[in-house]
Amino acid sequence: MAKATTIKIKLLSTADTGFFYVTKKNSRTMTEKMTKTKYDPIARKHVEFKETKIK
């Protein structure tokens, strides 16, 4: 079997609420850390989410 190209990552809110999303990314095409602007329901606004490892 071949090695999987997608890995699971955790997108953690930069608003320091502790809220996070779990998503997948292709590790071969996206080598840098992922950042996305998504909705944080605890902060009640759109904030930037940064990639961290799932523990």
From Swiss-Prot:
Which terms are listed as keywords in the entry?
A: Ribonucleoprotein, Ribosomal protein
Cysteine disulfide partners in this protein: none
Name any Gene Ontology BP term. translation
Q: Do you know which SUPFAM superfamilies this protein is assigned to?
A: Zn-binding ribosomal proteins (SSF57829)
Its GO CC terms are: cytosolic large ribosomal subunit
Q: Which PANTHER family did the record assign?
A: 54S RIBOSOMAL PROTEIN L39, MITOCHONDRIAL, LARGE RIBOSOMAL SUBUNIT PROTEIN BL33M
Name of the protein in question:
Large ribosomal subunit protein bL33
